[in-house]
From Swiss-Prot:
It is found in: Secreted. Its EC number is 4.6.1.18. InterPro entries: RNaseA, RNaseA-like_dom_sf, RNaseA_AS, RNaseA_domain. It comes from Oryx leucoryx (Arabian oryx). This is Ribonuclease pancreatic. One of its GO terms (cellular component) is extracellular region.
Length: 75
């Protein structure tokens, strides 16, 4: 339940409930410097076949917020 509350709060506070709902929104719980540092690390193929993804050398804390069957725009 706490992840659900976090997702609802973050989606509203960042105005991510405008126009349409994306199936997944990912929030990274790391410093901006740590996130930016990933871009200078190993370039790898993305899951969708594109080549503009990067592999972090360290584990990062994230929260994936997924649209549920009961999700309703704009909430």
């Amino acid at each position: 339940a706490s992840t659900s509350n976090y997702c609802n709060q973050m989606m509203k506070s960042r105005n991510l409930t405008q126009n349409r709902c994306k199936p997944v929104n990912t929030f990274v719980h790391e410093s901006l410097a740590d996130v930016q540092a990933v871009c200078s690390q190993k370039n790898v193929a993305c899951k969708n076949g594109q080549t503009n993804c990067y592999q972090s050398y360290s584990t990062m804390s994230i929260t994936d917020c997924r649209e549920t069957g009961s999700s309703k725009y704009p909430n």
